[in-house]
Design a protein with these regions (language model features):
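Nucleotidyltransferase catalytic core that binds NTPs
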Residues: 1-145
């Protein structure tokens, strides 16, 4: 697994990704990553996980300090064991938090060569977590993902 923060220092191959904090890399996370790997293999693409070193809610709420199951290093080690090709460790900033889901998906496609996103049925993101699965599908169609 190749790990990078923000901008890859290598030519990243077109890939299928999932996105989340992945604390503990539990059974549900591993199932989702298996789906990413299967979709990627079916399309002849690499597989990737987009995650964050700090819980996004900590960035938005100064008084939020969750008790985590794993350190960032432990999370990376567990993700490497899933067989995923890339781990993209992005800093979650207030600027990212203000992006719409569509804007964020566009950045993922252009900067990180993500061709498709695989998300759980209840995953939400975008400014104020305003967008869900149906929105992913619509934006994905609009962006060619």
């Amino acid at each position: 697994m190749q790990l990078f923060c923000e901008t890859p220092g290598f030519d990243i191959r077109p890939n299928v990704a999932t996105i989340g904090f992945f604390d503990g890399v539990h059974r549900g996370h591993r199932y989702l990553i298996e789906q990413v790997r299967a979709v990627a293999a079916g399309r002849g693409l690499a597989s990737s996980v987009v995650t964050f070193p700090v819980h996004p809610r900590e960035v938005m709420q100064a008084d939020y300090h969750p008790k985590l199951l794993t350190t960032c290093d432990e999370k990376v080690s567990l993700l490497a064991k899933t067989g995923v090709d890339y781990c993209m460790m992005l800093d979650f900033t207030p600027e990212i938090a203000r992006l719409s889901a569509r804007e964020f998906m566009s950045i993922l496609k252009e900067r990180y060569q993500i061709q498709a996103l695989v998300v759980g049925y209840d995953h939400r993101f975008g400014h104020n977590r305003s967008d869900g699965f149906e929105d992913y599908v619509r934006y994905g169609c609009e962006l060619g993902m």
